[in-house]
């Protein structure tokens, strides 16, 4: 029987996402979600966390509520899900960027059963009209992405994340899956306690990246060293982290990096919420 179940799950993976096999703990996590149990996932960036709730959402009755901290992340995931389906209503997000007409269309798709994944920022989830709407909906499970934002001990603490559990209680309880790529044991305990999922099944993946190495060098004429290093690796891409916006602008504005294609991303550009 288990062999048939394994085969069926892989068939669905291939059908919906085009993959022939799962990565790491993905299959075990998905089975736990499908069984209706609370799930805590600690998995490195690039490990395939999103699939751990996307595939179960497609296979279960109802709509999965996905809570994510940034509009850009939600939009990217919704766009990606729509490429896997002929129905654009398969995934939606609800936030302040939508006008009344767009919100009405999203809610209609959800009520008609077309939508399997509905994304919210925590600030949007807590709005009274959204809570009232979701009370009418059959929720398959709740997925809390970037769950470290819940913990005051975490580096990206978001106060609204700590309101998620009370709001879930208002909407209607369902299994939870919390996912993060960064959580110390202390942060993990805080997440599980705050979400009321202390008995959750825990899945931890290895963070070892054999293709990466760390090297520490004394600082001597840093700008010259950066230029030399870039030119030694011609045709390749890299990321330079700076401690200030000013330094990013200096490096990418032409005063330091000469004859090198460069672009800068400032911290504030990633801080787009709700």
Language model features: what each stretch is:
Residues 72:
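Conserved Rossmann-like nucleotide-cofactor binding loop
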Residues 1-2, 118:
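Intrinsically disordered, low-complexity N-terminal extensions of nucleic-acid-metabolism proteins
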Residues 7-16, 20, 24, 28-40, ...:
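Helicase motor core with emphasis on the C-terminal RecA-like subdomain
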């Amino acid at each position: 029987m288990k062999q048939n179940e394994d085969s069926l799950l892989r068939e669905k993976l291939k059908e919906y996402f085009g993959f022939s096999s799962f990565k790491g703990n993905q299959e075990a996590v998905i089975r736990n979600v499908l069984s209706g149990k609370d799930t805590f996932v600690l998995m490195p960036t690039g490990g395939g966390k999103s699939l751990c709730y996307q595939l179960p959402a497609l296979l279960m009755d109802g709509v999965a509520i996905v809570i994510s901290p940034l509009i850009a992340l939600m939009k990217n995931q919704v766009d990606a899900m729509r490429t896997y389906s002929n129905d654009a209503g398969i995934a939606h997000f609800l936030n302040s960027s939508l006008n009344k007409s767009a919100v009405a269309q999203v809610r209609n798709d959800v009520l008609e059963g077309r939508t399997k994944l509905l994304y919210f920022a925590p600030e949007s989830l807590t709005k009274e009209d959204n809570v009232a709407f979701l009370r009418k909906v059959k929720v398959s499970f709740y997925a809390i992405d970037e769950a470290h934002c819940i913990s005051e001990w975490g580096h990206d603490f978001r106060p609204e994340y700590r309101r998620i559990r009370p709001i879930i209680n208002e909407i209607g309880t369902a299994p939870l899956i919390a996912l993060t790529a960064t959580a110390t044991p202390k942060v993990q305990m805080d997440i599980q306690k705050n979400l009321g999922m202390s008995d959750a099944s825990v899945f931890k993946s290895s963070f070892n990246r054999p293709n990466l190495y760390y090297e520490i060098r004394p600082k001597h004429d840093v700008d010259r060293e950066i230029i030399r290093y870039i030119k030694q690796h011609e045709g390749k891409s890299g990321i330079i982290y700076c401690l200030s916006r000013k330094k990013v602008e200096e490096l990418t504005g032409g005063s330091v990096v000469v004859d090198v294609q460069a672009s800068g991303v400032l911290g504030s550009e990633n801080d787009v919420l709700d």
